[in-house]
């Protein structure tokens, strides 16, 4: 369950899930004496499921990269046992908006234009992390989503979604909490633009064409004739 917070907000792949699991387990238990992370990796490797964007197939490479503490966000409300109140959510939303607006490139958000809409924040929620040694860390998981038009090399445009999962922590990479200063610890992106966005657009176009949803596809090709069920022997 911890791994779900380490997934990109859109177009999740099995490779993304493996990276999320390895990252979550490394956060929870850096030593991993039982070999849980190695078992996950071996199970995925045997099934030929490998992440496309990892530098190599090692624990260090599969973990999402952590960020330094040079880009503080400011003070965010922690909330109580029942989460954030309405006022705290409004305050958090405003602080996040200001941070995102000032750091769009850092968060790998595409520039707004004719084919790309403005970003939205569909959800954010506080997390209290307790690792195996009993250390506690407060974090905030934020989903940022953009909608744009995919324009592959051939065919017409179609809607695509991109975005970033931002995990904000009270701990810097040095491991110490700093009062009133919180930092982006992970930026897990599925951008709309650049080579990754273009590759996803081509894959999505091919999928839609196969389903017959593109102008050069044939929807009837995949239509099932249920009348044939009554024509058996």
Predicted segments with their positions:
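Non-catalytic terminal regions of proteins
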Residues: 1-6, 16-18, 22-233
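Flexible, glycine/charged-enriched surface loops at secondary-structure junctions
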Residues: 11-15
């Amino acid at each position: 369950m911890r791994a779900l917070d380490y997934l990109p907000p859109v177009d999740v792949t099995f490779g993304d899930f493996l990276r999320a699991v390895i990252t979550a387990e490394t956060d929870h238990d850096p030593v991993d004496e039982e070999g849980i992370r190695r078992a996950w990796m071996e199970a995925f490797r045997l099934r030929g499921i490998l992440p496309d964007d990892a530098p190599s197939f090692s624990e260090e490479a599969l973990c999402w990269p952590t960020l330094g503490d040079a880009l503080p966000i400011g003070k965010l409300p922690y909330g109580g046992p029942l989460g954030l109140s309405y006022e705290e959510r409004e305050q958090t939303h405003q602080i996040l908006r200001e941070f995102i607006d000032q750091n769009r490139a850092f968060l790998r958000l595409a520039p707004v234009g004719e084919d790309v809409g403005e970003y939205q924040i569909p959800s954010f929620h506080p997390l209290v992390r307790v690792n195996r040694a009993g250390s506690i860390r407060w974090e905030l998981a934020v989903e940022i989503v953009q909608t744009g038009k995919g324009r592959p090399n051939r065919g017409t445009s179609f809607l695509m979604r991109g975005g970033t999962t931002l995990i904000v922590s009270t701990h810097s990479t040095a491991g110490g909490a700093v009062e009133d200063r919180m930092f982006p610890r992970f930026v897990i992106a599925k951008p709309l633009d650049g080579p990754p966005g273009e590759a996803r657009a081509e894959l999505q176009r091919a999928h839609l064409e196969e389903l017959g949803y593109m102008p050069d596809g044939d929807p009837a090709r995949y239509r099932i004739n249920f009348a044939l069920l009554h024509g058996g022997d």
